[in-house]
């Protein structure tokens, strides 16, 4: 996980990305080099996400359990930890404590 506490010289899309009846809300951040990230919050719940691109999920605060598509093992992540999700796949996430995250699209 990067040690930066803020992103400088970026554009932010004003409209929120709201998923699962408001259980997951994020905003898209656009970087000068064309890359993008989302900064978001997931409330305590169990969800199944699909990915287009590969993703790196960096947990800023909170706690979750994650099971990647094709795996039978759950992994637990907390603040300061991260996990990668392959593109064109799915993952289950069980949020145990409200999750503050940064998602990088790889």
From Swiss-Prot:
It comes from Burkholderia ambifaria (strain MC40-6). Keywords: Glycosyltransferase, Transferase. Coiled coil: none annotated. Its EC number is 2.4.2.1, 2.4.2.2. This is Pyrimidine/purine nucleoside phosphorylase. It holds the Pfam family Ppnp. Catalyzes the phosphorolysis of diverse nucleosides, yielding D-ribose 1-phosphate and the respective free bases. Can use uridine, adenosine, guanosine, cytidine, thymidine, inosine and xanthosine as substrates. Also catalyzes the reverse reactions. HAMAP family: Nucleos_phosphorylase_PpnP. CDD domains: cupin_PpnP-like. It catalyses: a purine D-ribonucleoside + phosphate = a purine nucleobase + alpha-D-ribose 1-phosphate; adenosine + phosphate = alpha-D-ribose 1-phosphate + adenine; cytidine + phosphate = cytosine + alpha-D-ribose 1-phosphate; guanosine + phosphate = alpha-D-ribose 1-phosphate + guanine. It comes from the Bacteria. One of its GO terms (cellular component) is cytosol. Belongs to the nucleoside phosphorylase PpnP family. GO terms for molecular function: guanosine phosphorylase activity; purine-nucleoside phosphorylase activity; thymidine phosphorylase activity; uridine phosphorylase activity.
């Amino acid at each position: 996980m990067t040690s930066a506490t803020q992103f400088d010289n970026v554009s932010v899309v004003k409209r929120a990305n709201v998923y699962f009846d408001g259980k997951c809300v994020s905003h898209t951040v656009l970087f000068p080099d064309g890359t993008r990230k989302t900064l978001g919050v997931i409330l305590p719940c169990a969800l199944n996400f699909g990915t287009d691109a590969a993703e790196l999920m960096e947990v800023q605060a909170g706690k979750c359990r994650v099971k990647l598509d094709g795996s039978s093992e759950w992994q637990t992540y907390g603040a300061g930890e991260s996990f990668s999700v392959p593109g064109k796949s799915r993952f289950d996430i069980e949020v145990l404590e409200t999750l503050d995250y940064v998602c990088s699209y790889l």
